[in-house]
């Protein structure tokens, strides 16, 4: 089995038919209002203390050679779990395999098991006893890399509700989890403030960010952080003259530069992205390609949690964050018109404040960390390996 997994990953076997995927995803668009009409999950956190005692210890593993955003995800999950008393060790591929915790959650398996010493962890016992946290969109080569590891695991968690649903249809244990949805300040280090990108900020955006800063008081009109793609490049080139009239911050990283790492100048980028969003009226989300996944890191962690209004081209529906209630959604062709209305008219400013207030209420009142952790622990307790209890 180990050889099969390695061959599939190294040789890139298998692919997703994009036409079939588009047909499937278009059907999932009907999910939006239907899901909201369903009764809410009846499980609560009354059994949390028993679950914490039962599960006891969890290891969250993330590659040291992967994207720094995966470290953000691991830290958010660990913070949520620790807040309820769970013992959590955030580990990497250099940890001792034989003394790993009884419950192991591997973040971004396409990175962890294929980079550096992570290949040493491609063992039947590790994979069959572990849980995987999927982070990649179904149509991508990174998803293909992660698929063998996910299928060999005891269960998978995913930040995308549609991806988790697809695995559930295969009778696999799967759970959608949205970690760390809360307002947060993003302090910069002195080294961050020496980064070239910090040097181009307007003076009013150089101070500490405040998620509660009013829409009209934010010095940056529109910001975008992401990786360059033909679709994104075409959008920004087509609308360059429009954006030139506004205070904008646009960081499009070229794919050839590789993942954003935690060390060196790259280490400042994720903090700077949050800092910029915290000073932006609008955080823009333009999908890399035609499949409009709800992009948690940019839309929620960077944008909404920084108090910025998120504007996106159409997304797959999300069970909690609803288009035109918690973010504004528009066809990419008409996004400049929407931005102009928001930034230049009183009606637009009122709409921006309405949506920001909805997000504030949702994050403050609906994302109970205890319930989120209880769902995760219940999932681990139900599907873990009995041999490693």
Which positions does each model-derived feature cover?
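Intrinsically disordered, low-structural-confidence terminal and linker regions
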Residues: 1-31
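Nucleotide-sugar donor-binding catalytic core of glycosyltransferases
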Residues: 20, 27-101, 108-125, 129-323, ...
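CheY-like receiver
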Residues: 276, 338-341, 379
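A charged, aromatic-enriched C-terminal amphipathic alpha-helix characteristic of glycosyltransferases
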Residues: 346-385
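Conserved catalytic or regulatory cores that recognize and/or transform ribose-phosphate-containing ligands
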Residues: 316, 321-324, 329-335, 362-364, ...
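Short, hydrophobic/aromatic alpha-helical segments in well-folded domains
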Residues: 152, 299, 338, 358-362
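C-terminal "capping" alpha-helix adjacent to the active site of nucleotide-linked donor transferases
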Residues: 331-350
């Amino acid at each position: 089995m180990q050889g099969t997994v390695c061959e599939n990953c190294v040789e890139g076997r298998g692919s997703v038919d994009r036409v079939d995927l588009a047909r499937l995803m278009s059907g999932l668009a009907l999910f939006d209002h239907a899901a909201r009409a369903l009764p809410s999950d009846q499980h609560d956190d009354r059994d949390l203390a028993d679950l914490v005692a039962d599960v006891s210890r969890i290891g969250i593993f993330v590659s040291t050679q992967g994207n720094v955003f995966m470290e953000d995800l691991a830290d958010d999950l660990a913070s949520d779990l620790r807040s309820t008393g769970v013992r959590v060790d955030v580990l990497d591929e250099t940890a001792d395999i034989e003394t790993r915790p009884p419950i192991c959650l591997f973040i971004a398996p396409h990175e962890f098991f294929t980079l550096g010493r992570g290949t040493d962890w491609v063992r039947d016992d590790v994979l069959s006893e572990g849980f995987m946290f999927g982070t990649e969109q179904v149509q991508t080569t990174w998803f293909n890399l992660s698929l063998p590891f996910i299928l060999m695991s005891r269960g998978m968690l995913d930040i995308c509700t549609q991806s988790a649903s697809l695995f559930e249809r295969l009778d696999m244990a799967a759970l959608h989890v949205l970690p760390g949805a809360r307002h947060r300040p993003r302090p910069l280090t002195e080294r961050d403030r020496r980064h070239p990108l910090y040097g181009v900020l307007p003076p009013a955006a150089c101070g500490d960010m405040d998620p509660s800063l009013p829409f009209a008081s934010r010095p940056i009109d529109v910001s975008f952080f992401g990786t360059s793609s033909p679709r994104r490049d075409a959008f920004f080139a087509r609308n360059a003259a429009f954006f030139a009239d506004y205070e904008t911050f646009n960081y499009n990283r070229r794919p050839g530069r590789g993942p954003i790492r935690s060390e060196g100048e790259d280490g400042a980028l994720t903090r700077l992205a949050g800092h910029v969003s915290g000073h932006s009226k609008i955080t823009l989300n333009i999908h890399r390609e035609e499949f409009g996944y709800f992009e948690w890191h940019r839309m929620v962690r960077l944008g909404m949690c920084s108090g910025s209004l998120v504007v996106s081209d159409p997304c797959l529906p999300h069970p909690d964050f609803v288009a035109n209630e918690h973010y504004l959604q528009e066809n990419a062709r008409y996004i400049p018109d929407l931005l102009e209305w928001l930034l230049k008219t009183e009606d637009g400013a009122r709409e921006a404040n309405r949506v920001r207030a909805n997000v504030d209420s949702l994050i403050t009142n609906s994302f109970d960390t205890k319930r989120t952790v209880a769902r995760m622990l219940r999932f681990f307790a139900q599907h873990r390996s009995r041999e490693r209890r």
